[in-house]
């Protein structure tokens, strides 16, 4: 498996330009499209590359997946147990309280307010991640990635609740 940044010919940094990512992805998809192959072997090879390009693009375009991938490149694998150990008891308590808050909220307008709050939390955390990766501070990057993962869990739970209210 080739490094996703190298595959898409991008600098290996967290703060990537998503428009350039998309442009590179589509250019590479055209270049390695299986239908452009002249031989069966070439077609098979292009199919493998196209599949890797899809994985690379879906990973790098998502802030959380990109952070997890960059940590993985540094041999830091964030499993659920490790993530829980990175957050303080207070942070975990806040997370569970937020889960209960979502569960107990009835009004759609209140759910929208919560959604806005989580979007702000996510953006602040992404900004912290950018700084941590720029400074090559893997400890902070790991902590902020775990926080972002919790925020994403809250956002997913909230989306389910909003759908059930419609």
Curated annotation (Swiss-Prot):
Biological process (GO), any one: protein complex oligomerization
Signal peptide interval: none
SUPFAM superfamilies found in the cross-reference section: Chaperone J-domain (SSF46565), HSC20 (HSCB), C-terminal oligomerisation domain (SSF47144)
Protein's UniProt keywords contain Secreted: no
Domain J positions: 3-73
Entry keywords, A to Z: Chaperone
Domain of life of the native organism: Bacteria
A GO molecular-function descriptor: protein-folding chaperone binding
Pfam families (UniProt xref): DnaJ, HSCB_C
Family: Belongs to the HscB family.
Classification via PANTHER family: IRON-SULFUR CLUSTER CO-CHAPERONE PROTEIN HSCB
Oligomeric and partner information: Interacts with HscA and stimulates its ATPase activity.
Role played: Co-chaperone involved in the maturation of iron-sulfur cluster-containing proteins. Seems to help targeting proteins to be folded toward HscA.
Full protein name: Co-chaperone protein HscB homolog
Protein species of origin: Rickettsia typhi (strain ATCC VR-144 / Wilmington)
Gene that this polypeptide is encoded by: hscB
């Amino acid at each position: 498996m080739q490094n996703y940044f190298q595959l898409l010919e991008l600098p290996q940094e967290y703060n990537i330009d998503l428009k350039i990512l998309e442009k590179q992805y589509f250019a590479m998809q055209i270049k390695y499209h299986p239908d452009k192959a002249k031989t069966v072997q070439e077609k098979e090879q292009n199919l493998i590359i196209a599949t890797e390009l899809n994985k690379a693009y879906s990973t790098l375009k998502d802030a959380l997946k990109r952070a997890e991938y960059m940590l993985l490149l540094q041999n830091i694998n964030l499993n659920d147990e490790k993530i829980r150990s990175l957050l303080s008891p207070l942070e975990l308590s806040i997370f569970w309280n937020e889960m209960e808050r979502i569960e107990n909220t009835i009004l759609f307008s209140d759910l929208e307010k919560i959604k806005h709050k989580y979007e702000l939390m996510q953006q602040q955390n992404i900004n912290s991640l950018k700084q941590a990766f720029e400074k090559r501070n893997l400890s902070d990057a790991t902590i902020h990635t775990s926080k972002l993962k919790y925020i994403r869990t809250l956002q997913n739970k909230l989306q389910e609740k909003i759908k059930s209210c419609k």
